[in-house]
Amino acid sequence: MAVTVENLEKLERKMTLTLPLNTIQSEVATRLKKLARTVKMDGFRPGKVPMSVVSQRYAYSVHYEVMNDKVGEAFAVAANEAKLRVAGQPRISEKEDAPEGELAFDAIFEVYPDVKIADLANAEVEKLSAEVSDAAIDKTLDILRKQRRTFALRAADEPAQDGDRVTIDFEGKMDGETFAGGKAEDFQFIVGDGQMLKEFEDAVRGMKSGESKTFPLNFPADYHGKDVAGKQADFLVTVKKIEAAHLPEVNEELAKSLGIADATVEGLRSDIKKNLEREVKFRLLARNKNAVMDALVTNAELDLPNASVQAELERLIENARADLKQRGIKDADKAPIPEELFRPQAEKRVRLGLVVAELVRANELQAKPEQLKSHIEELAASYEKPQEVVRWYLSDNSRMAEVEAVVIENNVTDFVLGKAKVSEKAISFDELMGQN
């Protein structure tokens, strides 16, 4: 087999392959004979169809199949011998000027780039830190108490206030007509919890049981109901029942109800702090990891294989369609999604993947067995039966591959932070959690 490789633009290459014609013909004949032993045709017994008939019927498809197989095998062998790291699938076409007795093909393809990472000592990375404060523990305690709150009927002359559960009938109209979803009976919500629009809650707050009120309400322009978004409606609301919330005290009983081993107030707060610290650790790791990855992309030079970018584009668009379908969007699989919407993201992902792969290879940052074990145990620690979670991960190769990818990213993060110019920045617990 004769092979030549020509450099085209940037990462593009052209390989010319020459194969003996008799190799193709011999394989076609072998496959046709094998096919003749099992093929079924009207008028013939199984395995008794004449070769001339089998050849007439199947020669073209078998020849096409053999050509694909042989050329694909030849390309793979030649690329391996030439130490070419092929990105994507080659575009193969037959040449017309092949020497007699031979078949010649051109394969145009891309190779993965050489990745040049600048000196990481000059890279700048902002590393975040955060602590679990007493205020964060108190806020979590309040959430836990609200989840276990009970309600008692208010006196008839007591107005609705924040935290109360109200039962109402309401009807909203536009131009005198009730709109879809604008009417309900015995509807319940907690005043001040943000379940309803602020204008609606403001109108109900202060009303008493048995009271009715009519008021205008302006729907926001970005309201999820497109038929009413940006419009004004007139609502009639009748309050049927008001119930005041009663939160459990922070005591041993609450600790017991939450399944805390040390069923004391101190034990409860300690358990909450431990869980919050675990969450803080994971969130800080994610934020700092993103900062490191951004620094890596900035400090690397490389060309991107179009084949890899296109494959990533198609994956992102497919994910977008699946998301639309999950949201109940009609004909989501046919919705036109411009590639350019996702191109920057696809290019960044491909670039980052190539840079990380090179950094891992050059610095031996692969995941070690003890790291995988430690990470799985850490993930499982927050569950009631951690050993079952550990077994769940270990029993599936795809789940283990995900764990391995995370550990490698963590190794890369630690490696870069150990080399780069790192500036420390302390942020509040609420800022880290995205809370106001």
Swiss-Prot record:
Its EC number is 5.2.1.8. It catalyses: [protein]-peptidylproline (omega=180) = [protein]-peptidylproline (omega=0). Consists of 3 domains; the N-terminus binds the ribosome, the middle domain has PPIase activity, while the C-terminus has intrinsic chaperone activity on its own. This is Trigger factor. The keyword Cell membrane does not apply. PROSITE patterns: FKBP_PPIASE. Belongs to the FKBP-type PPIase family. Tig subfamily.
